[in-house]
Amino acid sequence: MAEAPIVVKVGGSLAETGRLKPILQLIAASQRPVVVVPGGGQFADKVRDLQNAIRFDDAAAHRLAMLGMHQMAEVYFTLEKRLAPADSLDGIARVLATGLIPVWLPLQMCQDDPEIPANWSISSDGLAARLAERMGGADLYLLKSIDVLPEASIEEVTEAGVVDPAFHGIVARAGLNWRILGPSDDAAFAAMLAPSPAKFQS
């Protein structure tokens, strides 16, 4: 039986720390099936700045922020040739079947999804959780530019602003296994990408 893919959200902030390329190299060498969710990073930040300047509505900002994730994906494609775009569950399956690693482009699946709020209460973290839910409850890893204690609860990371407000509800509804990985966790992340990793621990 084929191993179930994991969902890995690669935070856009990693591009500002020098950690992005090494992480993408680890993912490109993965011996497990992986679906990458790109963070919006500075592209999404610019949407927020522009909205503050000219006051367009949250629904438009939500779509533009998702397109910021698409822009970040384009950056990822230039850095690792084993990454390929996918904008649907079927597309993800097709890319995985070729032996490549799908990078999810969220707009098509998310713009009319009634489970996704069209505002700033959800970011790429919550969207990654929603994708994991729609994939049947895939294990979810969020790669961040800060370290988080392994024992930190979902309530604590939400209160601290480490994840978006919508993340908690999606994870709880879907019963997802999840973990946040910071700079100190890269060796552990590499081990998770081996063919038979240790049992998931959130």
Question: For the regions a protein language model found, what residue spans apply to each?
Answer:
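Nucleotide/pyrophosphate-binding catalytic subdomain
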Residues: 1-199
